[in-house]
Amino acid sequence: MKFPETHPVVLGTVTTPSGLRFLARKKLPADAVEVRVDALLAGKVPAEKIEAALRTKKHPVLLTLRIPAEGGQLAWKVAQRRELFLKLLPHVEAIDVELATVRAMQPVIDEARRTGKNVVLSAHAIQKPATPAQIARWVGRFEPLPATILKIAGRIRSWRDLQQLAALLVNHPGWPLAVMGLGPYAAQSRAVLTALGSRLVYGYLDQPAAPGQPSAAEVRKMALAVKLTK
C-alpha cells in the first residue's frame, strides 16, 4: 500500500476510539486517513490498541504525533515520542513531523525515508495568523525532497490572512505544498487553497481535529469539484 500520488489528497482525520473503526472500512470519503496518536492517547486509548487497528487498515495512513505547541493534545517526552513513532512506522505510509521538531525526530524521518514512506513537514499558527516573517522562516527551512510535503496551517481572521496563505501556492507553483486555514473561515479557505494547488486537504471522520475543520465528506465534494474544473 502506498500514499496517494495524485492531488489533492483528501485526508480523513481520526482522533477518537470509535474513529479507529474507520481504518477497517472498505469505503471512506477520503483517499487516506490521518491517525492522530496524540489525541487518541489523551483519550486513554492504549498504544497497543492503536497498533492493532493499524494492522487491520484498508487505507493508506498518515501518522501524526502532534506536539501541544502546534495543536497536539499530549505533552510528549522526546524519547517517548520518538520510540512510538518508530514502533508504529511499519504500519503506515506517511508521517507528519513538525518543522520545529525535525532535529529531535531526525531518526524517525531517516527511517521513514529509508523504508519508502512519505514525509509531511508541518508548521502551525494556531492562536493567531502567521506573520510574513514566520512564513518566510518556515519556507526557508524546507528542502523539497522526493516524497516530502511542506504543510502550513494558519489561523484566518480576515481575507488578508487568506491571501497571505494563497500567495505561498502562487509564488511556489512547483513546490509540494499543503496549505490550509484554521478557525471560522477554515472551510472557505480549503476551497480556495485546494483550487490553487494545495497537495493535501483535511476533513474529520469522527470529530474535528483542528479549529473549524470540515468533515471529510464535505472536503471530498470540494476536492472533486476542483478536479472537474482542471
Each model region followed by its residue ranges:
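Catalytic beta/alpha-barrel core
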Residues: 13-15, 32-43, 64, 85, ...
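Conserved N-terminal beta1-alpha1 strand-loop-helix module at the mouth
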Residues: 1-70
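Acidic (Asp/Glu)-rich catalytic clusters
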Residues: 23-29, 44-58, 83-90, 106-116, ...
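Glycine-enriched alpha-helix->loop->beta-strand junction motifs that scaffold or abut catalytic
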Residues: 29-32, 89-94, 109-121, 143-149, ...
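C-terminal alpha-helical cap/extension of soluble enzyme domains
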Residues: 169-230
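Active-site-adjacent beta->alpha loops and helix N-cap segments on the catalytic face
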Residues: 40-56, 99-115, 130-133, 157-171, ...
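Short, acidic/polar
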Residues: 14-28, 76-87, 131-141
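Structural motif corresponding to the early beta-alpha repeats
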Residues: 60-86
